[in-house]
Amino acid sequence: MEYLLSIDQGTTSSRATLYAASGESLATASRPLAQHYPNPGWVEHDPQEIWEGQLACITEAVAKAGIAPSQIAGVGITNQRETTVVWERETGLPLHRAIVWQDRRTAELTESLKEQGLEAMVRERTGLLLDPYFSASKLCWLLDRVDGLRQRAERGEVCFGTVDSWLMFKLSGGKSHLTDISNASRTMLFNINTLEWDEELLRLFRIPRGMLPEVRGSAAGFGHTSGEVAGAEIHIAGVAGDQQAALFGQGCFAPGMAKATFGTGAFVVMNSGARPGVGDGALSTIAWQLPGEAVQYALEGSIFIAGAAVQWLQEGLGLIGNAREVEVLAASVPDSGGVYFVPALSGLGTPYWDPYARGVVAGLTRGSTKAHLARAALEAIAFQTLDAIRAMEQASGIALKELRVDGGAAANNLLLQIQADLLGVPVLRPRCTESTSLGAAFLAGIGAGVLDTSAIAAQWALDRRFEPQMERERREELHRGWQKCVRLSLGWEKN
């Protein structure tokens, strides 16, 4: 049997899973990851905790599976993207806490660049909007604020990387300073047209070229683990950012195929084929590059509050005792009774990109109940997904035929039925909803030569298909009501 090890580094946990090449999960181990909030809007991780947690997970998962590390054909890595790590090249020691993708400390810098009229240039080269979300402004902040860091970086003593780079450096015993093309595309320093680090963007953000990792295809081979670290020299065979890995794990290999991952937030990603999509609301990014093949691009929609809206019903309002109760409560009424909830609790993402938007509950009457608000919260997740997909359809010129889903909230049958009704296309839930981890394993399988995309596509198995049951006129009527409420929320904090 061929074994594949998937290393999945999330925002709140570290996880390692051992798979058979068939996609069967054999053993898994996880550790929580602490988040640090030194100032309002700041979010940090300890890179050493990331590394030590992953090492413990790898050791535990391999032991649970009862195999020797030497039996593993390939390691795949997937990770929270954009999170920025700097470390000393010689010792491998971190020089600052990692600045997490959620961190907003560089808002003034990105706003200033917008005011200088630079967003169109950045968008054309990277597919991304000028926003603190991405790595470039975070790295610029570190170079400016950490004493002596810029000078050391210019002397070649400092490495920068996203979390995949950090883990590869540590796993290889300091031999591999690499990243994959999907993670590079989230830094705002990588040109998605020329497929190179962009010299003009490096000058704009004042980043020394020598601190950047080498960029490789997603299954191109990334060296080997150190025998001292992992117990054997294992091929690091596949790497992708978490959302790209989930798209791959869902078998979305053809243009127009899309997946939505429902977690605290939600990410909707559509395969857009061999050319970047162009549109106002959706981000254009690189999905992956396989050996001997052209780069595959993707369109992405970011939804900041999805499952977190249900969490707010529980913790903020006390309407439910736990997240699982929301489905039963929402199903106790046939609709939301005209109640809308725009969960702009930390701004709105795709396609609005408004950090100043704030939450709105509208349409309340004397007959409104907590069940109506619970249903409105589920509808809010589905409406936001609809908005993101419409932006992607406009950018790609491709009409969505079905949506594959994963993540924790994909267990909510009512949510998925509402989603199908509002989209007007089937929503498909696979048997395995750990698509991110599985996608990293599949990329490792391709890199190790034990899998190909046709074998992966054949392994995708349906758990349940949700068919739309709502008339188009009713769907559009509900969406107009949603858009009216969104307009109320936009710019609220600024105005």
Swiss-Prot record:
One Pfam entry name: FGGY_C
InterPro entries listed in its UniProt record: ATPase_NBD, Carb_kinase_FGGY, Carb_kinase_FGGY_CS, FGGY_C, FGGY_N, Glycerol_kin
Annotated PROSITE patterns: FGGY_KINASES_2
Binding site for ATP: T11, T12, S13, T264, G307, Q311, G408
GO molecular function, one term: glycerol kinase activity
Annotated metabolic or biological route of this protein: Polyol metabolism; glycerol degradation via glycerol kinase pathway; sn-glycerol 3-phosphate from glycerol: step 1/1
Residues binding ADP, per UniProt: T11, R15, T264, G307, G408, N412
Annotated CDD domains: FGGY_EcGK_like
Family, per entry: Belongs to the FGGY kinase family.
Full protein name: Glycerol kinase
Protein source organism: Citrifermentans bemidjiense (strain ATCC BAA-1014 / DSM 16622 / JCM 12645 / Bem)
Taxonomic lineage from the root: Bacteria, Pseudomonadati, Thermodesulfobacteriota, Desulfuromonadia, Geobacterales
